[in-house]
Each structure stands twice: as structure tokens, then as C-alpha cells.
Amino acid sequence: MLSNPKPAKVMVTGASGLLGSWVCRELLDQGTEVIAVGQRTPLHEALATYRVRLDLCDREMLDSLFQQFQPSAVIHMAALADPTLCEEQPLLSRRLNIEVSRQIAQRCQSTGIPMAFTSTDLVFDGDRGNYLESDSVSPINRYGEHKAEAEQAIHNACPHAVIFRMPFMFGEGLYHPSPMRQWLDHLSQDKPLFGFSDELRSSVDYQTAAAGIVKLHTALRGEILHLGGIETLSRLMLMRSIASAFGYNPQKIEAKVQADMTFRAARPRDVSLDSRKARAMGYKTPFLADIMHRLVKGTDFSDI
């Protein structure tokens, strides 16, 4: 069901993250006031109207945050997103990924404002790929388990909330170096680098994902949407495509398979997402070659 036009003041948690900072920029570019919330490093003043350092686990401070700023919508992206850390610190993962999400959802419900939440493709087991929004979740690591639990907690507390399941993302960071930049630094210094040929994702860049979140976060109520890219490719293929686009020899990136390594957190084989539902609603996903061109040339897709 369609709702009202985009709100004038949006609270963004996890605002200093790689995706969060792009979401803040997209909101500002469309004239929206941004309340950027982070626990450690405040977002640069050019990317937010208001900047707040806050421990989201502090319920009293969370109440004060809503009372003081009275947001017209919330995009909740703060999370403990490292699967290994989630395995090593399960209580912290549960607190940050589930309980904080539940608390924010309850406040959005009580104040009657739209909420959007970024989940992950890792809620699926990766046995077949090309997952639809209606497919049952079946996570195989703790991060995926806790994000799946967070989805349900949010739905129970705030039934109108929109849940975005995000793929593996890449691109330049607005606030701090991204994994892609680290890969390129390794290549420039002839340091060893490898990618898995049997780990498949429907990857997309941060800017494209952020534009989709901003476009759709108040357009629907109570929906789950997949915001994957058009193409499914292995991590190795993605890394080699990036290397080639930036003028490096892609063969310098060694091919490995998951069986070559031992991981604390299980890694699914193919968690590619079917994102046709979001694209039908206006989510614009360029082909990988076009994304690479923009990353190298510094152009964008705002007019597509």
C-alpha cells in the first residue's frame, strides 16, 4: 500500500558505516534533514544535518533521542555485522542486532512513524540461490540467525516496518576506506590477494543500494524487499572485475574455494537474491560494467 510522500526529517542509525554514510548523502541530496546516529565516530558535518553519538543499548538515551529530534522516519542500519565477531561474542550480537532493533521498532510503532531496517542475504543457507522475499529463512551462522530474529522482532513490534535484505556491497567509502579500496591498495603494492570462486552473491555498490533504500523506505508498509544487483557472480569474479576496471592484472588475484580455508562463522555458497520486486517499484540496478565505469570515472546514475 502506498503511503505519504517522503518525510522531512529522517533518523539514520549506523550513519558512519559504509552504507549508512551513502544513505545520509542520498537523503541530503533530496532535501531531507538527516539525524545521523553513531556510537563511535560522528559523521562528517557535510553528510548530516544533526550528528549524535549515542549508545543505542541505553534505553533512556534512546527515548531522549526520539523525544528531542522527533524524526518523521527511521532507517535503522546499526549492527554488529562481522559474522566472526558475532560467533565470538554472541551476547553482544544479540543485544546489538536483535534487542536494539526491537527497541527502535517499538518507538517507531508508538510514535506512528515509518521504519526501515537493513537485514542481510545471510538469512539464507545458500543451498540454491536466487532467493525470493517469500522464501523461508534458514541461516547457517550466528549473524544470519540474529538478523532473521531481528526481522521477526521488528515485524512483531512494528508491523508497518519495511525490511531491506542487502547483498554483499562494494565501492568507495565516503567516510573511511572500504574493502574495495584495501583490495586496490594490495594490488598496487603487489601484496597477495585471493577471492573465492564458489561464493556467489548478487553484489551491488553502496551508492546504488543507498539510492534504493532512500527511494523505497517510505513507499511501502510492512514489506520485505531484496536489494541485490542484477548479476550473480562469485567474490573472485567481482574482485577481478574491480582489478581490471582500475587497470590492474586480474590474474594477480588468486582463486580459492571455501574448502581451502577454515572459518569461525560458516559461509553459505550461494545467497544471491531475486530483486525483481524492488526493481518493479523503482529500484534502479545498473549492470556491473556500468557500476565499474562510475567507480573509476566518479560519475553517478542519478539521471538514469
Predicted regions and their residues:
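NAD(P)H-binding glycine-rich loop region in Rossmannoid oxidoreductase-like domains
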Residues: 53-96
